[in-house]
Amino acid sequence: MEGAYILVVDDESRMRKLLKDFLSAKGYKILEAEDGEKAIEVFEENRNKIKLILLDVMMPKLDGWSVLRKIRQESNLPVIMLTARGEEQDELFGFELGVDE
C-alpha cells in the first residue's frame, strides 16, 4: 500500500500533523480534512485515489459517525476511527455503522 493515498480527518491540527509526518515517512500520500464537512468534500473529490480513511469521532460541523454513514452509502473503503473516548458502546456503535477498526 506504499504510495497510496490516506485521508486523515481530525479537528486537532497537531494530531493531523503527527499522523501526516509519520505516514508520509512511510511512503504514503496524505490528504487532510479538519472537520466532517471538509472530509466529505475531500472524499468526493478523491474517492478513486483514497485507499484508507483515518477518521476522528468528535469534530465540529459534522461528527465522525455522520461522515462514516455518508461514506458507507457510497463506498466500502476501509475506515479506522480515531477517538479519545474508550467506551465500549462507542466501539460497538462504530462497528454497527461499518467501521473497520
Tell me the role of every PLM-derived stretch.
Residues D35-K38, D63-S66, D90:
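Acidic catalytic/metal-coordinating carboxylates
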Residues E44-N48, K70-L77, L97:
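Conserved phosphotransfer cores of two-component systems
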Residues M59:
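Receiver (REC) domain active-site loop signature in two-component systems and cognate sites
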Residues D56, T83:
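Active-site residues of response regulator receiver
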Residues L7, E32-L52:
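Acidic, metal-coordinating helix/loop segments flanking the phosphotransfer/catalytic sites
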Residues K17-A25:
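Charged docking surfaces used in two-component/phosphorelay signaling
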Residues M1-L7:
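Non-catalytic signal-transmission and effector/linker regions of two-component phosphorelay proteins
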